[in-house]
Amino acid sequence: MKRFITLLLLLALTTALLTGCHGGKKRVAFRVPMEFDESKQYEISFWAKNDTNITQVNIYRQAIADFEALYPNIHVNLKTYTDYATIYQDVITNIATDTTPNVCITYPDHIATYQKGSNVVVQIDALMADPNYGLGGSKLKFDGPTEEEIVPKFLQECFIGDGHYALPYMRSTEALYINKDLVTKLGYDIPDVPTWDYIWEVSEAAMKQDADGVFLVNGQTTLIPFIYKSTDNMMISMLKQKDAPYSDSEGHVLLFNDTTKEILYSIVPHAKSRSFSTFKISSYPGNYLNA
């Protein structure tokens, strides 16, 4: 399932599909200032997800460095998380003590929960429309996108209740990467449309070892034939492929069915043989691609 990631702004200085908090100050309704005071020092806390991927962390750090070079009176404090659920829980926990971040990455459906607090999340419609500092603003020191340059469907997902409370950050997707050299070495061709039966068969074939525990296909003592980043998405995709339900638009949970049980039982042997692993068990799959 492709999930839409947003930056939510919690009552603070910034706007974007980020969630931000007040800290120890009394929360008051946000108003767009007439001017940006460049003589005043600002400190912004930013909570982001990086999947333990140092490449992502370095991208955040570089973006922050570039931003601070343009705005030397703004200092961004980055805190990274390995999953969205922990960010979500930490924001909720910190709302009570006014120690939420100024900006954070979130899913749109998390925003409704944050809104239960008074003046916790900033409605940013006025800021988006501001001719100076809004979308495509004339006084921005960088080439900011105009509203017309944002995919309308993505922006619509940031409209929660009575207005916009976030800006689009990224749309995730998934792809199947195949090590052609290893698969060919095992004696298999790569089909135009790989099936689960094909994936499991090739993965099990790759598990063959010699007497010393060395994998025959790569000559090493370590091998993960098949790894999936998100087991949530894996289940959603497998149910979709079998025309089986997962949930509906009204929020009903439908995944507890015979097809789900069948899928789980089909995966068990490959988990036991260790021909299959996940992000939670091993690591971020991209780390292996970058190795």
Regions found by a protein language model. Give the residues of each.
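Short, low-complexity disordered leader/linker segments with a strong preference
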Residues: 1-44, 69
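Hinge/lid segment of periplasmic solute-binding proteins
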Residues: 31-32, 36, 108-173, 215-216, ...
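Extracytoplasmic/periplasmic substrate-binding proteins
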Residues: 34-36, 47-49, 56, 62-64, ...
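Early extracytoplasmic/lumenal segment of secretory-pathway proteins
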Residues: 41-43, 53-112
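Solvent-exposed loop/turn segments at secondary-structure junctions
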Residues: 51-53, 83-86, 109-112, 172-175, ...
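Extracytoplasmic/secreted envelope proteins and their assembly/folding machinery
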Residues: 57-64, 88, 92, 108-111, ...
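Helix-loop-helix "hinge/cap" segment bordering the ligand-binding cleft or interdomain interface
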Residues: 69, 79, 125-131, 156-233, ...
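Short helix-initiation/N-cap motifs at beta->coil->alpha
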Residues: 80-90, 196-198, 278-290
